[in-house]
UniProtKB/Swiss-Prot annotation:
Assigned protein family: Belongs to the MukF family.
GO molecular-function term, one example from the UniProt record: calcium ion binding
Domain of life: Bacteria
Subcellular location: Cytoplasm, Nucleoid
Entries under CDD domains matching the protein: MukF_C
General function of this protein: Involved in chromosome condensation, segregation and cell cycle progression. May participate in facilitating chromosome segregation by condensation DNA from both sides of a centrally located replisome during cell division. Not required for mini-F plasmid partitioning. Probably acts via its interaction with MukB and MukE. Overexpression results in anucleate cells. It has a calcium binding activity.
Gene source species: Haemophilus ducreyi (strain 35000HP / ATCC 700724)
Taxonomy of the source species: Bacteria, Pseudomonadati, Pseudomonadota, Gammaproteobacteria, Pasteurellales
GO cellular component, one term: nucleoid
Span of the signal peptide: none
Record's protein name: Chromosome partition protein MukF
């Protein structure tokens, strides 16, 4: 098998060198090729006239909002470019002068198939592919148990595994890679929604998160249902290769198929675990953003009520209740002591209260400088500078402390003007804040 592969590589390099491939597909050219491929699939003879290609190019040109004046010239350039790059074949003769016929080349079919068909990945398609694989491996295992010479093994075992099962495994693997790319695109969409107006984006974000989670779980359930059976069939064939040194190429193929199947199976669970972590991160960000915005709006309304007291008087009712004793805190402390026991001083961690006290003290010292020098406080810049000093796990707690301390020092004059401040990024993890400059300090 290795010798065959070593002979194939030089031949493939020579073949590529002889044909002098030079592939370049900008977005409009790629769209033109995809439209040609889809239109070609609807034709019974698989042949395209130049007038058909010009009509298809006109549709692409309109979508890309290109000029209509030079349409024919640009269409001819695009057609010649696809022919030159061997995406299209042009046929003409002296009997059909001025009337050329075009066919999509195998290269054009392969490129368009990658962008069109591989995006049609679903649990139904995966089930059908795995069903075909199961039938092929079942027939190959039966043929392996019957046994025969090397020619028999090549025709009845090696051939179906190599040219059917392996290709389907490669197709599934490619589809999974497309799913990875799709997840990255969904993450970019969610980040874009949250950075603009997260009030309206929460529902859309939740829908994107749920749809992706459901798709991943459906695909993984389909893989789990068939994976063990396929592995057992491959082991069944492998057991028939014992003491058959002349069939080493079959054994190597079985090992490669087992590795591909393991990679396909592990992808699903890994993708689910990563997506669950991302889902939790987005929900934590949304909850924290809601809390911070709720406190800011409450403080703004309270200040407006106090300032407008004489024009719109109001009464303040207060109530005081005895604090309820929460036994759960004591119980949790006892359970923690029983589970952990006594630790050496070097291994003891600071309590959360001590850590917050240290942070509050440091933040107060930083913000007091602005008040003493009568400089306005840009919360976005201060948050970004301070958060860079702490790990990501503490960003939301530190941000809340900074906002609380800044509000205690003073207020923003623009808050009275009903002007919404712009969103400012405060870290490298898509968090942002919306606040005016604090330029009026309490004396």
């Amino acid at each position: 098998m290795q010798n065959e592969l070593a002979q194939t590589i030089p031949e493939l390099i020579s073949w590529t060198k002889e044909r002098e491939f030079s592939l370049s597909l900008p977005s409009d050219r790629l769209a033109f090729l995809l439209v040609i491929s889809i239109y070609n699939n609807e034709q019974t003879d698989g042949e395209l006239l130049e007038s058909d290609l010009i009509d298809l190019f006109r549709y692409v040109s309109n979508v890309f909002e290109q000029s209509e004046a030079s349409l024919l010239q640009r269409a001819n350039n695009a057609i010649n470019d696809l022919v030159k790059q061997r995406f299209l074949n042009r046929f003409s003769s002296e009997f059909t002068e001025g009337l050329a016929i075009y066919r999509v080349t195998p290269l054009g079919v392969g490129v368009s198939d990658y962008y069109v068909r591989q995006r049609e990945f679903s649990s139904l398609r995966l089930s059908i592919q795995l069903s075909i694989v199961a039938d092929e491996i079942q027939r190959a295992s039966v043929a392996a148990e019957q046994g025969g010479d090397e020619r028999y093994w090549r025709n009845n075992v090696f051939a179906p595994l190599k040219f059917s099962v392996a290709e389907i495994f490669d197709s599934i693997d490619l589809s999974q890679r497309m799913m990875d790319e799709n997840q990255h695109q969904i993450r970019e969409q969610i980040a874009g929604l949250l950075s603009q107006n997260w009030h309206e984006a929460i529902i859309n974000c939740q829908q994107l998160l749920d749809e992706t989670s459901i798709n991943l779980r459906e695909l993984q359930d389909t893989l789990n249902a068939a994976g063990d059976k396929l592995q057992s069939q491959l082991l069944r064939i492998q057991s028939c290769l014992i003491s058959r040194d002349d069939l080493a190429f079959v054994d190597q193929l079985i090992v490669n198929l087992q590795n591909k199947l393991d990679r396909i199976m592990s992808w699903g669970q890994q993708a689910i675990d990563l997506w669950i972590g991302y889902d939790k991160h987005v929900h934590k960000f949304i909850r924290t953003a809601i809390d911070m915005d709720k406190n800011r709006v409450f403080g703004q309304r309270l200040r407006q009520s106090i300032q407008n007291y004489f024009s719109s008087p109001w009464l303040l009712y207060t109530a005081k209740a005895e604090a309820l004793l929460d036994l759960r805190d004591d119980e949790a402390m006892l359970n923690e002591m029983e589970a952990v026991g006594e630790l050496p001083m070097a291994l003891e961690y600071e309590s959360l209260t001590d850590v917050q006290t240290q942070i509050v003290t440091a933040i107060q010292a930083e913000l007091a400088h602005f008040r003493d020098t009568a400089q306005p406080i840009n919360l976005g810049a201060v948050l970004r500078e301070q958060l860079a000093r702490y790990p990501q796990s503490r960003h939301f707690d530190v941000a809340r402390i900074i906002v609380d301390q800044a509000v205690k020092l003073g207020m923003a004059s623009q808050d009275h003007q009903a002007v919404y401040p712009v969103w400012q990024p405060i870290d490298d993890f898509s968090a942002a804040v919306q606040a005016h400059l604090i330029d009026q300090y309490d004396k």
